[in-house]
UniProtKB/Swiss-Prot annotation:
Entry GO MF terms: D-amino-acid dehydrogenase activity
Required cofactor names: FAD
GO BP of this protein: D-alanine catabolic process
A GO cellular component annotation in the UniProt record: plasma membrane
Name recorded for this polypeptide: D-amino acid dehydrogenase
UniProt enzyme class: oxidoreductase
Organism superkingdom: Bacteria
Gene3D superfamilies named in the record: D-Amino Acid Oxidase, subunit A, domain 2 (3.30.9.10), FAD/NAD(P)-binding domain (3.50.50.60)
Pfam families to which the protein is assigned, alphabetical: DAO
Gene: dadA
Residues annotated as binding FAD: 3-17
Amino acid sequence: MRVVVLGSGVVGVTSAYYLARAGHEVTVIDREAGPALETSFANAGQISPGYAAPWAAPGVPLKAVKWMFQKHAPLAIRLDGTQFQLQWMWQMLQNCTSARYAVNKGRMVRLAEYSRDCLQALRAETGIQYEGRTGGTLQLFRTQQQLDGAAKDIAVLEEANVPYELLMPADLARAEPALAATSHKLTGGLRLPGDETGDCQLFTTRLAALAEQLGVKFRYNTPIDALAMEGGRIAGVKCGNEMVRADNFVVALGSYSTQFLSGLVKIPVYPLKGYSITAPIVDAKSAPVSTVLDETYKIAITRFDDRIRVGGMAEIVGFDKKLKQARRETLEMCVNDLFPGGGDTSKATFWTGLRPMTPDGTPIVGRTPVSNLFLNTGHGTLGWTMSCGSGQLLADLISGKRPAIQSGDLSVHRYLGETAGQTRPAYA
């Protein structure tokens, strides 16, 4: 079958690769000049299935109020003047219960664990290189309350059979030797030895090249205007004066998916603004060896070959992509506090991107009420972590194969109430 994939970020490119490997004729369309030039360009770099968890969690509403008065707050909110933002935040609040958190985290871990398995198989099959490391990830706690609170996450990890280690301050240097100098600031850590790291932009670029070898056509610098309906199905996508036709269509447009699908399928995907800096390593012994996550500031610090990537934070501010110096200062403070002398932050590049977030944290992957329209979006801060599994899952669905994991609760239908064949929008 002919399949058009809209979007060439890591989610779009993995979708195209797995579709091509399944024997489909695939075309990828993107407005940018190449793959992974927006949200996938400079993310935090961790592939963390075990840490897959929704931002909508018990206690977050109260924390959000406190964060409003903190200089280095991990979350910031500014009204963007749209009703959609208010609706999205309200639905996110409804997911901040213990019961909803457990359900949402459970399905996120399910997809993320499967995705890591798919990535490992892909790496073994192709030999793709992307400055990846398989040294696990380490979540660091600065307070006793954070350490005690890890018990809830550990329960979910045990239920999903995810290996873990709960480390005391004296043990942290076993996982990250450079923390020997700063472990006195910490109360402990949760290590997941099965997690990985890597440069998402490098991976996406090289996977796109592999996809081309399988026959995938990439059309860059191409406007994506609208989907055209004929007889209850998608007939094609309007790209300027051209209509590109296919049998099936995949929307992998990240935060822009919601507006693009307006009037066709209503999805609650909102841009969650994040920041990163990338600093050259000046002392390898003082730098991390894998990924460290600072629970207090919600910041990830990741080691690439000769660089340190520091990324995180979340701003609910719409499509504002301005770089804020205060956010850079927070990222620099965090990495210099934990790994002083490891990298030269004065020479770091500064970046921001918009992560496509759903109010429950789970991405939207799968079928829609339109028979030949499929979605692969809404991965939030876990697009890199979940990309391969989402791409394989989508390829299986389009190919008519039974997916390797439960997938019904990952589709858009969890937001849609269907009665007598009629679909009610998520916010009707």
